[in-house]
């Protein structure tokens, strides 16, 4: 399926490309539809994508599961697949991404809201979560990604610049934790994926849930802390990462696990 088939189903919307087809997936923003139809987002990806985060059928399942449990996520408008492709259409959710340049007086409130969201996700029941991201599954996928050349070795964190896939795997094996503190994790809990009300700094939406699943809580807090600390969003920094961890619950944080899960993310 190409996007023309889906475009014919939404002929009154203007289609705006959001990305450039990372891992074969395309995301479009649909605006200008007939009132009172909301703004929409459409994702189109291979039916069997190389990157599991672009399994759109699985993402739709995760969105519907989160909605049933009271987490603010995009409403699924349409989902489907044919022989070659899958698609997912969702309503846009209101709010401003936590990654945006918030006024200085609101920034600590933004990271505290992210921490509260992490706690809310981690309190959801693991028994009926629709996906498994335990280490056995995640490490197996990491090995496949190395074997298939899917790890971007030019985009590693500074301390691992120049490493090979085999070096990454060796370090992953060496530092793998013996036990997992299992909760429901978002899987990519970065500031870009959390939307907040610009007035109250309360969470209004959670997006890009393709990696949601049962995993150690550090799979979330490690990525959130890293993204708040590094200088890609220079209005944040180490003090904001520390505030996030404090608000989440510093007594729950294992620094060795933080490092391990930041390493694990290099494979995805």
Curated annotation (Swiss-Prot):
Pfam families reported in the protein's UniProt record: APH
Reactions accelerated catalytically: kanamycin A + ATP = kanamycin 3'-phosphate + ADP + H(+)
GO BP, sorted A to Z: response to antibiotic
UniProt keyword Kinase present: yes
SUPFAM superfamilies per the UniProt record, alphabetical: Protein kinase-like (PK-like) (SSF56112)
Annotated catalytic residues: 188 (proton acceptor)
Enzyme Commission (EC) number: 2.7.1.95
Highest taxon listed in the record's lineage: Bacteria
Recorded GO MF terms: ATP binding; kanamycin kinase activity
Keywords per UniProt: Antibiotic resistance, ATP-binding, Kinase, Nucleotide-binding, Transferase
Class in the EC hierarchy, top level: transferase
InterPro entries registered for this protein in UniProt: AGP_Transferase, Aminoglycoside_PTrfase, Kan/Strep_kinase, Kinase-like_dom_sf
Entry's family note: Belongs to the aminoglycoside phosphotransferase family.
Role description: Resistance to kanamycin and structurally-related aminoglycosides, including amikacin.
Name by which UniProt lists this protein: Aminoglycoside 3'-phosphotransferase
Species whose genome carries this gene: Streptomyces fradiae (Streptomyces roseoflavus)
Lineage start: Bacteria, Bacillati, Actinomycetota, Actinomycetes, Kitasatosporales
Gene that encodes the chain: aph
């Amino acid at each position: 399926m190409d996007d023309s088939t889906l475009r014919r189903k939404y002929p009154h919307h203007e289609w705006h490309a959001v990305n450039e087809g990372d891992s074969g997936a395309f995301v479009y923003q649909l605006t200008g539809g007939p009132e009172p139809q909301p703004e929409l987002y459409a994702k189109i990806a291979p039916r069997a994508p190389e990157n599991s985060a672009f399994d759109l059928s699985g993402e739709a399942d995760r969105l519907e599961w989160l909605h049933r449990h009271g987490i603010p996520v995009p409403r699924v408008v349409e989902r489907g697949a044919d022989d070659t492709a899958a698609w997912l259409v969702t309503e846009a959710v209101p709010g401003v991404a936590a990654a945006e340049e918030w006024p200085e007086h609101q920034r600590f409130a933004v990271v505290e809201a992210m921490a509260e969201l992490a706690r809310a996700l981690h309190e959801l029941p693991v028994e009926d979560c629709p996906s498994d991201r335990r280490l056995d599954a995640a490490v197996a996928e990491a090995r496949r990604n190395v074997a298939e050349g899917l790890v971007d070795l030019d985009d590693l964190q500074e301390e691992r610049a120049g490493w090979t896939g085999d070096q990454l795997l060796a370090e992953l094996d060496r530092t793998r934790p013996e036990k997992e503190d299992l909760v429901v994790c978002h899987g990519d809990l970065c500031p870009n994926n959390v939307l907040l009300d610009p007035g109250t700094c309360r969470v209004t939406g959670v997006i890009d849930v393709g990696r949601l699943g049962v995993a150690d809580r550090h799979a979330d807090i490690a990525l959130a802390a890293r993204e708040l600390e590094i200088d890609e969003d220079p209005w944040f920094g180490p003090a904001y990462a520390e505030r996030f961890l404090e608000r989440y619950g510093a007594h729950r944080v294992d620094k060795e696990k933080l490092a391990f899960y930041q390493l694990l993310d290099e494979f995805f």
